[in-house]
UniProtKB/Swiss-Prot annotation:
Membrane topology, as annotated: Single-pass membrane protein
Keyword Hydrolase included in the entry's annotation: no
Signal peptide range: none
Cited InterPro entries: PSI_PsaJ, PSI_PsaJ_sf
Name of the molecule in the record: Photosystem I reaction center subunit IX
Keyword Thylakoid: yes
UniProtKB keywords: Chloroplast, Membrane, Photosynthesis, Photosystem I, Plastid, Thylakoid, Transmembrane, Transmembrane helix
């Protein structure tokens, strides 16, 4: 179990998880607000 925690805390794994989360977030934003170069929320 300690080896799994050590593996999951390495930089490539954390980078892949954070980039995957960011990509999913951008995909969902573009799904609800298509072609939005600026976000007129004001």
């Amino acid at each position: 179990m300690q080896d799994i925690k050590t593996y999951l805390s390495t930089a490539p794994v954390l980078a892949a998880l954070s980039l995957g989360f960011l990509a999913g977030l951008l995909i969902e934003i573009n799904r609800f607000f298509p072609d939005a170069l600026i976000f007129p929320f004001f």
